[in-house]
UniProtKB/Swiss-Prot annotation:
UniProt name for this protein: Ribulose bisphosphate carboxylase small subunit, chromosomal
GO biological process, one term: reductive pentose-phosphate cycle
Source species: Cupriavidus necator (Alcaligenes eutrophus)
Disulphide linkage map: none
Keyword hit for Coiled coil: no
Length: 139
């Protein structure tokens, strides 16, 4: 099951050329670019691990692509995403993010239904990868 998170989540995988164009767009907007990775892609897991420091001072898309490739080589079986941070007053938030690396096998999620008092049903989702293996050995 292909995880759909981020700006281009329903499109086919971006090529390095397309990623470079998106990085150039982010840099032209004055946004700071950062890289994050995780082995737990649960939709509520918004706090991924930072790969290095945010690239506030880097203004070259080729340099950022080198960092992306470095992250891909370091974590080939993890999800890696690019985030673009807008530091403009009143925005101060991530304004764009997209996945640039995925594990070869994405097992997906399962729906868990729990019965609560008063005929209440509570639903949640769990990642098959998290259920089967501990952190760091999921993919």
């Amino acid at each position: 099951m292909r995880i759909t998170q981020g700006t281009f989540s329903f499109l086919p995988e971006l090529t390095d050329e397309q990623i470079t164009k998106q990085l150039e767009y982010c840099l032209n907007q004055g946004w700071a670019v950062g890289l994050e990775y995780t082995d737990d892609p649960h939709p509520r897991n918004t706090y991924w691990e930072m790969f290095g420091l945010p690239m506030f001072d880097l203004r070259d898309a080729a340099g950022i692509l080198m960092e992306i490739n470095n992250a891909r080589n370091t974590f080939p079986n993890h999800y890696i995403r690019v985030t673009a941070f807008d530091s403009t007053h009143t925005v101060e938030s991530v304004v764009m993010s997209f996945i640039v690396n995925r594990p070869a096998d994405e097992p997906g999620f399962r729906l868990v239904r729990q019965e609560e008092p008063g005929r209440t049903l509570r639903y949640s989702i769990e990642s098959y990868a998290v259920q089967a293996r501990p952190e760091g050995s999921r993919y």
